[in-house]
Structure formats: C-alpha cells, structure tokens
Amino acid sequence: MYQWIQRDSDVHQRWIWCRRLLIVSLVSALMSVLQVIVFRFVDPPLSMTMVGRYLEAWSDRQWNFRLHYVWCDLEQIAPSVPISLVAAEDQRFPFHHGFDFDAIKKALGRHSRGGHLRGASTISQQVAKNLFLWSGRSFVRKGLEGWYTFWIELFWPKRRILEIYANIAEFGDGVYGVQAAARRYLGKGAADLDESDAAQLAAVLPSPRHYNIQHPGPYIRWRSSWIQRQAKQLGGSAYLDMH
C-alpha cells in the first residue's frame, strides 16, 4: 500500500512540475511575441547586442568604453543606404518571408564540397539576433532566432525591418547604426551619404570590428565597389520602392 501511495505522489509531483514548465514556456512565448509587437511601433533604446558589448567591456575592465548609438528614422537616411545594405547582405530581402532557403541550400552545398560554411542569415534574422538575442553560435540561439524571425516577418512591414536593421547594425567597435557610423567615420549625417559612402559602410558588416571604415584596406575597397555594382544591377533604390 505504501508503495502505491508513494508512486501516486511521485506521479503527482511530476505532473505539477510539467504543468509549471508548460506555464513558464507559454508565458515566455507570449512575452516574446509582445516584444515584437511593441517594437513594431516603438524605436528600441538599446539592443541585446549593445548590452552584450557593454558587459564584455566591463568584464575586460574597459571602464572608459562608450556606446555610440543615435536613432534615425528611415526617412532621414539617404536612399543609397537601404539599397546598399540589401545589396551587401540580403538581395532577396523584398521577396522572402524571413528565411532565404536558396541561400541556405547553396551554403550547405559549398560546405559539403569542402568549402567554408558561410552564414546565410537574412536581414530579418540578423534583426532578430541583434535586437533580442545574444552573439555566438548554438542550436538554442538559432532556434530562438528562427522563432523571433517568424513573428517579425508576420507583424512588421519590410520597411520597419530595414529601418531597425540600419539603426542597430554594428559598424565598428561600439558604433551602432548608420547615423552614428556616418558621423564618427565619415563626418556627415546619414541623410548626406552618397552611393560610395553607403557602400563603404555596408562593406564592413560581415566583421565590423575587424575592418576600418576610415582607412579601408584592399578588401573593403573591393567589396565597396562590388556593392555599388550590385545595387545598380538591382535597380537602385527603386528596387525597394517596388515592394
């Protein structure tokens, strides 16, 4: 009799913990969706990537570290910037729903042939990671990135996705957003950037702390020229106006 009672008690305890876990999971999922809805209308004061950079600086005792971040509405950013970002990072941005499966397939194909596994993250995925998550590679983060990307694409128009991307992308150590980068590295505002300036900013995005916008090396000069050519082939800023 005692064994039956003990067994029933164990089953009851497991049920309680499963129910609690389910409730926590549902609340967390709901909160994440609410986050996405809020930032559809509210400009983010910070991103998780910025918070992570602060913590990294403090852990390294970089007490004088400063974050450079100035929000700038898309209407106040030169038209050359959005098309340069799309040309550099995600040329199918107007057409996909957050995931570019063609790019993923090509990346996996290159890797299977012995090549380096390059990222195939869309702009939407990068926004999800930079705004809500942490840096680094893990299946957990990738899974959460996919979750946030789905809701971002559902609730935000493409214009809003591109606006937030242009404002929270890192262009240098502690320098986030087109406005801050333009002022710090090019001595002008985001509204005054020409095609060459925009391409130069976009060229460093794969590794912004490694490359220098003010003193670009051969690779950045080459990539900047490539981005300008790609932007023109896409049709310039009209490529984004049509979609």
UniProtKB/Swiss-Prot annotation:
This protein's record includes keyword GTP-binding: no
GO cellular component assignments: peptidoglycan-based cell wall; plasma membrane
EC number(s) stated in the UniProt entry for this protein: 2.4.99.28
Major subcellular site: membrane
TM stretches of this protein: 21-43
Pfam families for this protein: Transgly
Localization: Cell inner membrane
Pathway info: Cell wall biogenesis; peptidoglycan biosynthesis
Keywords: Cell inner membrane, Cell membrane, Cell shape, Cell wall biogenesis/degradation, Glycosyltransferase, Membrane, Peptidoglycan synthesis, Transferase, Transmembrane, Transmembrane helix
Domain of life: Bacteria
Catalyzed reactions per annotation: [GlcNAc-(1->4)-Mur2Ac(oyl-L-Ala-gamma-D-Glu-L-Lys-D-Ala-D-Ala)](n)-di-trans,octa-cis-undecaprenyl diphosphate + beta-D-GlcNAc-(1->4)-Mur2Ac(oyl-L-Ala-gamma-D-Glu-L-Lys-D-Ala-D-Ala)-di-trans,octa-cis-undecaprenyl diphosphate = [GlcNAc-(1->4)-Mur2Ac(oyl-L-Ala-gamma-D-Glu-L-Lys-D-Ala-D-Ala)](n+1)-di-trans,octa-cis-undecaprenyl diphosphate + di-trans,octa-cis-undecaprenyl diphosphate + H(+)
Topology class, membrane: Single-pass membrane protein
Role this protein plays: Peptidoglycan polymerase that catalyzes glycan chain elongation from lipid-linked precursors.
Name of the protein in question: Biosynthetic peptidoglycan transglycosylase
